[in-house]
Amino acid sequence: MAVATNPFRYGALALDDAFTDRETEVASLLSDVLNGQDVVVFAPRRYGKSSLVWRVSERAIAQDVLVAHVNLMTTPTTERLAEKFAETIHDDLASTLFRTRERLRVFSGLRITPIVTVDPTTGKLGFSFDAGRQPQDLDVTLERLLELPGQLAAERERKVALVLAEFQEIVDIDPELPKIMRSVFETQPEVAHVYLGSKRHMLERIFNDENEPFWRSAKQMEIGVIAPDLFRGYIDAQFSRTGRPVEAEVVDRVLETTLGHPYATK
């Protein structure tokens, strides 16, 4: 069997053996998710917050939690956000809770009925909403989509975690969206809302400004660099997997240079 020649994986999510420690953060965030606690995770880009949340998601799913992910960086408009929420609700929630023919019934109460398409290659469903309808119709439709995770959690007696990546983008999509989201999310005790973002100043304004709808609505977790002692063991293990041990002096010099920054170290 061939062994890997590169000890590290970078430029993509660090999963399985590529994930670097952070067991304290994993345990804390997992506990919050299991208890329905809303959390905002602060970290600069390339600090591993997405990999951390994926690790927590895997463990939460193993404990029967339904986990749904939406990346707001891919939803520049309200219409696209509604489409993405519909896709996520179908793929991450309804697909687990219902048989195939029953899944689309989840969307029967929407103001705008979604247009459903099927990717001929993957079989994945896509959702779109008629952009020609009145803006208020789209707003009502999106609000109803935001309500669905909580409704499904209550009706099926399941815990749900809704992960919203790059959450600071919500303000650019529509300045009124934080009000709509907050009014819905505060009525969903069965749902743990996990907010991720890389623009700290924007997230701090959203969650720490008393004039904002999300003021003090979520526990705050900051992801920092990885302690050298923890990183050192990980580096040694990764090199050992390739059959090429690394000298301790080399590892020390690298960590002195990167100061434990995850991406820079790898």
Where are these regions (language model features)?
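A short, basic N-terminal segment
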Residues: M1-V39, P44, R99, R244
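Short, conserved phosphate/pyrophosphate- and ester-handling motifs at nucleotide-, phospho-/glycolipid
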Residues: R22, S50, H261
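P-loop NTPase Walker A phosphate-binding motif
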Residues: P44-V70
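AAA+/P-loop NTPase substrate/partner-engagement loops
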Residues: A62-K84
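Conserved NTP-binding/hydrolysis module of P-loop NTPases
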Residues: E79-R99, T113-K124
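Conserved Walker B catalytic segment
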Residues: S128-R200, N208-E210
